Amino acid sequence: MKTLLKNAREQKGLKTREVAQLLGIDQALISKFESGSRKPTREQVQKLASLLEIDLETIMVVWLKEKILYEIGQDEFALKALQVAEEEIKYQSKVSKKKLSTTLQNILDEIDSLKIKLDSFRAFDSYRIAQALELEYTFESNRIEGNTMTLRETDLVINEGLTISGKSMREHLEVINHQEAIAYIKDLMQKNTPINEREVLSIHNLILRGIHPEDAGRYRKVQVMIQGSSHMPPQPFLVTKEMEDFFIWFETNKNSLNPILLAAEMHERLVTIHPFIDGNGRTSRLVMNLILLQHGYIIANIKGDYESRMQYYQALETAQTKNNKEDFLLFIAQMEKESLERYLSIIGQ
């Protein structure tokens, strides 16, 4: 543990004082963690993993191993106790695992089959096809949020640099910014950059650039309400803590959860926190699609027509107010399935 923490800190070019300030932990404690004279708590381990970009599973295994050795390492019955504990842990793990509904599992199985087919035809990938689908994604994602530009107008703004008569400057910026944000998440995917607070804030900064420059890439400082929803986002003083928990949840589940469900969960959790004054929906969908791209899937394009938008909002509302995410997970899985089917049909497979 001590070597893992020290090496990770030095690789990040941080001093113990800087780590302490960023995490709100006493500098003396950081030094003790690295010397091995003090063990961090679970919460401190999770925060250190997020800040120092250490794989959470790796550091948690080391932490638990040292915790076990400290408690029973020298006891004559240690091995026997571990064997009994292993069986109990296996049993509890089986009991605690949530069973997916048949409908959701069937869609995930269909997605797996479509992805296998897609992977076998990667050679047919076309820049022009990708460009066209990304254009559609920008159009639909902005349409969900009330942007009135048509698909053709969106194309003219992005690819021809034209100004559309009768459309506001904000609508033009929303189109340009979203397209640049897509390019940004594709770059993150290609570089295999881990998802963390810095990258989420960077995505949001692109979305609001030139629209709300003072709020772009910053958590909100005021309370907000979501029009048409009974869900009340957390108070502004809670946002930073909620976002810490958001990234801890991601690190804890990123290696064990189905990628479609992981992406959908991150989408729902981020938009429920509503950490920004504006641009929460677009940012949440981009984070979701970054996760999908990182796992070899394609962008799940949620349509902005009235029927699709209402289905999307209702599924979110149910997740936020009734603590039932089934409809939302089904909705996102269906969107990815339809996106895969369309992509395969375009390349003629």
Predicted regions and their residues:
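Short basic helix-loop element that most often maps to the first helix and adjoining turn
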Residues: 3-22
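DNA major-groove recognition helix of helix-turn-helix/homeodomain DNA-binding modules
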Residues: 43-58
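FIC/Doc superfamily catalytic core
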Residues: 66-76, 86-349
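Helix-turn-helix DNA-binding elements, focusing on the entry/boundary residues of the two helices
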Residues: 5, 16, 27, 42-45
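Recognition helix of helix-turn-helix/homeodomain-like DNA-binding domains
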Residues: 24-39
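Conserved hydrophobic/aromatic packing and binding residues within compact polymer-binding modules
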Residues: 5, 19-20, 30-33, 59
